[in-house]
Amino acid sequence: MISNTYKIELPYASVFKESWCLVDIETEGRFWRTSRLLAARVITYGSPLEEYEWIAERESDEYDILSELAQVLMRSSCILTFNGNSFDLPHLRKKYQAYRAQDPTKGKKTLDLMRALMPYKFMFELQSYRLADYLSLFHGKYDIRNDAEGALLVSSLLELSNLFTLPDTSCEAGMLEQEGESKKIFRAKWKTPDEMPIAIEIFDEVFHLTSCGSYVRLEITCDGSVLRRYYIDYENYDFLLAEGYAAHRSLTAYVADDRKEKAVRTNCFSLIPVSSVFPDRPDRLKKYIQSVLVYMKRGIDRPFDIEDPV
């Protein structure tokens, strides 16, 4: 058996903390009974992070790899994986059971990055959502030796949730005239506490959000002199067809059914004058921008879905 230890310097999610570890295994096939364990890698939290790697040279090395891996997992409280709740962890449990050895994954919480990143899909232009697809977003900026290091790097994408929280720092804002059109553009710019792992661009017919490094820019197309303010609890609103905006059902109870319809995420908004949030109302400006960010982030919310021990 070949054993290696590395110091790791890669971006990673802030959720990865003390007593956590990241695990990845390589096997000959998918079925545990007929598939030999070829390698196992585990990255542990520290300053810097450490990676332990065990590679089989012969068939009998499988048990030794499992034994070495168990010593590290026993010291961990939560196991981070990429698609590990579907493959790596069930495979390991079966292997330990087959050798009649204590299962080091028992009683550990787990976080599967593949599942945790699902709400972020709208932010990426990917044909599929395998580890290699997520790694392509980094454009080869980092040297990755194996899938364990790849999963660690991909975990940093969870930090993109910070794009949708306006920091306490000041926010630059202004109104731009759009050449050749009657519509106007409302633009806001601010700095995030930490640099984002990748550049991001999100847009629809009204909003356009871009991020590069630690700077975020939000552009909003105005309907004349008004802005759309969205509400996330759209199930409590009706969209008024003639008026072109949504109102709470406590206010629409007596509106005829043919003049309203149930609001959905994309039309659950009210219209507010630009002058009410700009230029000399910083408190209202921040409140308005935050409402837009809450609308744009969709299903991205913390805490992450950390699964309880099995």
List where the protein language model places each region:
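DEDD superfamily 3′-5′ metal-dependent exonuclease/proofreading module
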Residues: 1-310
